[in-house]
């Protein structure tokens, strides 16, 4: 994990140390190295966490002719193969780091290079001779990148709060984004909760040149059904998982696996343990209460693969209240995910033992593992029954007593039956509607602009989704902004 930031054109007199103060606000992302590039036309800063090539690869990295500069957060898994291809085209390399491969690739293929990179990245590339800045983000938005346009100038950084360091960036709430938060429990990209600050969408590049800003999508997911058997599909999935984990095991620093005991992280551990030449470290958190604690499962998995296992009991005397403000600070934007708390303490436990940790995040989206995804499939069958029958079933379900469980069976049944009366995408958002909670009502009451963005209106995400034709095979993968809490830790 690294941090990048910058803005074209040197600041006004008196702002000369701003890029250094922005980099200082990102220091937790890159504790190993800090560097800057400044010219009469741009200020760039980078903080680096060294994972590959610990001796070279400091950033910003400048091309041999001094014209092109790169700041980069991420990892390019196929950089070795691309290095050979670029060497055959006449490029020479001074380091073994993937940053230099990305720089050479951009000089060779311009923005077409991004489709050649397999990995996770947020990158800024500056051409001094052309006065041209290009920002780009990986296919799924694993690495974050925020930007703001003020007049003729562009400002960007790996974290939203880093932009606040610059005196030109105001802190005004975007009420439409606030409505999105109460509807979805997070703010989907490209919006942020701050008016005028945007997330660069996944799979996009953005160009600033001659005071003009343009953006273009360079990758888009495409559903291409294949006529293969279940056995063939499983073999292909296993091979792709094996390759993906193998590429993530490449590291010049200690590496471990976050293990929850579920299928996701256990699968990652399997492919890591069967390909690693050293004993792996695993890290887990446990809870009181059978409903949440997966301790028996992750201990069994860790024992089976013989890992060097580390476990943290969250019921110990941990300063949860004291850590809360720091956790929120790292999240940049509000997200109604209580999992941020155990992830924070898990990261704190991991850091003394490993610099890099693999996790099973994203598998539920890939494998339709959430209950709402199954509800979509069941609802499709339910819609084949008469509407009158569905309404009678809903009436009967409302007679069931309310349970004291967090999400009881009767709640799920009522939401499911009422959702079966709605169009498919609108029903998906209906399963658990946060905007109906008391927390959202005062905001809607005090700000008519927010009230008008209800799902029945035209501005809220649910309303937009209900009008968008569904793509075959897609559930609701939240790929508007893929970076997660642990990525910012």
Q: For each predicted feature, which ranges?
A:
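Glycine-rich active-site loop/lid subdomains used to bind and stabilize high-energy intermediates
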Residues: 46, 151, 210, 300-489
């Amino acid at each position: 994990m690294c941090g990048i930031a910058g803005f074209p054109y040197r600041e006004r007199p008196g702002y000369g140390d701003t890029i250094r103060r922005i980099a200082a606000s990102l220091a937790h992302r890159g504790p190993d190295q800090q560097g800057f590039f400044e010219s009469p036309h741009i200020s760039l800063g980078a903080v680096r966490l060294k994972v590959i090539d610990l001796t070279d690869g400091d950033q910003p990295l400048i091309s041999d002719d001094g014209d092109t500069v790169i700041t980069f957060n991420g990892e390019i898994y196929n950089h070795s193969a691309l290095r050979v291809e670029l060497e055959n085209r006449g490029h020479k390399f001074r380091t073994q780091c993937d940053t230099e491969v990305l720089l050479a690739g951009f000089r060779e293929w311009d923005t077409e290079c991004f489709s050649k990179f397999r990995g996770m990245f947020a990158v800024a590339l500056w051409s001094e001779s052309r006065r041209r800045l290009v920002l780009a983000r990986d296919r799924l938005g694993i690495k974050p990148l925020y930007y703001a346009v003020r007049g003729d100038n562009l400002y960007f950084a790996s974290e939203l709060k880093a932009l606040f360091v610059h005196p030109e960036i105001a802190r005004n709430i975007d009420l439409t984004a606030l409505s999105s938060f109460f509807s979805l429990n997070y703010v989907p990209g490209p919006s942020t909760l701050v008016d005028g600050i945007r997330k660069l969408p996944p799979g996009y590049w953005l160009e600033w040149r001659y005071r003009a800003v343009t953006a273009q999508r360079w990758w888009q997911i495409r559903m291409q059904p294949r006529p293969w058997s279940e056995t063939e599909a499983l073999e292909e999935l296993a091979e792709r998982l094996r390759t993906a984990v193998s590429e993530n095991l490449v590291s010049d620093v200690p590496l471990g696996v976050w293990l929850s005991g579920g299928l996701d992280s256990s699968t990652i551990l399997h492919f890591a343990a069967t390909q690693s030449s050293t004993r792996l470290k695993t890290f887990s958190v446990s809870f009181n209460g059978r409903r949440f604690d997966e301790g028996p499962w992750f201990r069994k998995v860790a024992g089976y693969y013989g890992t060097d296992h580390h476990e943290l009991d969250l019921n110990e005397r941990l300063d949860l209240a004291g850590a809360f403000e720091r956790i929120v600070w790292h999240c940049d934007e509000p997200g109604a995910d209580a999992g941020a708390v155990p992830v924070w303490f898990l990261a704190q436990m991991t850091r003394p033992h490993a610099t890099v940790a693999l996790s099973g995040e994203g598998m539920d989206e890939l494998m339709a593992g959430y209950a709402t995804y199954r509800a979509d499939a069941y609802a499709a069958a339910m819609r084949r029954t008469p509407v009158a029958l569905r309404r009678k079933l809903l009436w009967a379900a409302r007679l069931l007593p309310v349970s004291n469980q967090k999400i009881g069976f009767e709640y799920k049944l009522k939401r499911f039956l009422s959702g079966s009366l709605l169009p498919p995408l609108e029903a998906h958002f209906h399963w658990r509607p946060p905007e109906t909670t008391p927390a959202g009502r005062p905001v809607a009451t005090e700000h008519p602009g927010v009230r008008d963005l209800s799902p029945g209106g035209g501005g809220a995400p649910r309303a937009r989704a209900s009008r968008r034709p569904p793509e075959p095979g897609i559930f609701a993968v939240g790929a508007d902004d893929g970076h997660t809490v642990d990525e910012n830790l």
